[in-house]
Amino acid sequence: MVNTSFETLPRHMQMEILSRVPLKFLMKFMCVSKKWASIIRGEEFREDYLFQSMKRPRVLFVIDHREYLPIKPEAFFHSVYQEDQPLLLSGKQRMRTFETPLVQVFQPIRGLICQQGYGKIVICNPGLKKFRSLPQIKVHKGAPMRTFFGYDEDKDVFKVLCITWLRNGKRSEVSKEYLVYTMGSDEESSSWRLITCEHDHAPVTEGLFKGGVLYYGAKSNNGKSVVMSFNVNSEDFSVIELEVEISPYWRLVNYKGDIALMNNIEDSLYHSREFEMWVRNEVTGNWDRTSIKISHWNGTVDGKTFYFKGTIGTKELAFAPDYWFGEQHFVSYYDTETKNLRRFDIEGMVDQDDFVRTFFDHVDSTWLI
């Protein structure tokens, strides 16, 4: 029998083996061998590793933890494989990315998340416990700021869209700026670029990134509810008309391949719960309204307040609480075709009372390694 070392294996076999290694061990491997480090940092390996990770997507919990006296805001990241039963924690990543509490966290894209604090934005890879701070945006004190996160597949770069606006004493809008930041795989510093938008609007909902386009609910300058789309590659805005008035309680999701709006207001009726969803037909451009009634709701969630958080894949609706009170944690999935409501208990979560943001279909990535 011939002894074969890792170093003597063909490069494609080395990549195949490394693509199955957990992120925390990849970091150690990079310190052992310059050759391994070169492979792990490569673009080809990054795509292979992402592909393997997509086979077992995770639920990501971003916990806005605050300690008082003195105030020490921190972000805790927990992740679990979203189809295992029970959901077993793969560990906790702890990062202090801000001196102030989190304001906004965008959906994970290719293993990265974009976080906004007061006047500060960072892009981080929770699996690696690494982050990159973006240049400070100069805004007047108290001026609102909304951030959205996307990926340009053609140029292999991430982009952050930031919208700031000022108001006068009567709360009417005075001015608005649209800024874009581009982040590639290298560590070269970039800067915010001012772009133009011909459709004056104010963001209302959180965003959805799908197929190279950012979508978010907004109010036009005449107060009408619309969905704005932003092509991450061309950096062009367009308006999608709506037939319903929206508020921050509405959430945009990818539902069976189409973009959909779902009302996230708590509205339980006895033991059931009913949601209103508007699904856009990509061919006709029309919005179709559907009502989703979930039976046995209260019995599954133990009477707790759960909110719609997104979809698993593209068809199962996922629900989780906004706040945990040091008790048994779990998430719920609802299949709109089979009408099956599933509960997944989360084992190993530390008991604590914190505000929690829950994201689904998160994957591990070697970006920022």
Curated annotation (Swiss-Prot):
- Matching PROSITE patterns, A to Z? FBOX
F-box domain residues: 3-54
Give the range the annotation lists for the signal sequence.
none
NCBIfam families the record matches:
F_box_assoc_1
Q: Can you name this protein?
A: Putative F-box protein At1g70960
